[in-house]
Amino acid sequence: MFLINVTHHSLSQISEKFHFQKNASSYEEDAGATSTRLAAAALSYLPLRSYSSSSHILDSAAGPGIVTKLLLSPSPADVSVPELPVSPRPRVTGIDLVPAMVEHFKANKASLNWTTADAYVQDSEDLSRFKDAEFDAVVMNLGIFNLRDPVAGAAEMYRVLKPGGYAVITTWKTRRVVEILQGALDAIRPNSWLKPMYMPPEWLTKEKPSSVMEAGGFHKDQIETFEAEPNWECGSEEGIVKALNSPLWTSKIFEGWSHEEIGRWNGEIRKQLRDTEKKTGTLEMSAWICVARKG
């Protein structure tokens, strides 16, 4: 999932959980398309053709079920992974620390007829509800960098995977959205301490995800890292401005702001946009996909 928080990681987890509890209903609408494109790219590195109704996949830090939707429902037009959705449907279990996200997952399950899926409120670094060697794959899309102890999370993935199973994690490499949000924030409140969508800088590197997976028990020779470009497609300049005015991004930023300051937001967002972004309605985003196999 995306993240807005402060620089101290222990406080950021509390902030993040509260933020997504409050804004869970808007997450899929405002961030879902980009997250879906990245998740589809990540899933393309799994042996999808080998999965069947007897397979079991863990959607960890599942949010509203973006990974699960790709596995079980017809793909959106901008996703072209031939093996998606998987048929026959595998069993998919979704977990998320945010209760509202799990409720959203369950609502999607009901409306989209995910008869082979279920979801639970569960910390992704504590998979004690699951047995050893239970899953054929574990997928954590944009979640590993939010854990208190990412290595413990990786070790739990390793434990619950069957021998020969795959764990896939994703993290960002570049985030144009962050530059725009930060630029607008700094223009209005130059002395603010807030860092929208803050991530520890090391998580933007290619080396960090693979080092965490290796420390969690995966053999170095069984870890590969790939790059993806799941750009944020808003359709137009107005689409970008509208998207970056969503409470998903602004509810934390606007805390304590005056009406005058809030009124400046859209204008400052426009000032941050490059000419090509205004013409295309596209913001560049790139990401790392780390794939680890349990030997």
Where are these regions (language model features)?
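Conserved Class I S-adenosyl-L-methionine
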Residues: 34, 66, 202-295
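A generic alpha-to-beta junction signature in SAM-dependent methyltransferases
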Residues: 50-51, 75, 86, 161, ...
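Class I SAM-dependent methyltransferase SAM/SAH-binding core
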Residues: 55-128
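Conserved catalytic/acceptor-binding region of the Class I
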Residues: 151, 158, 164-235
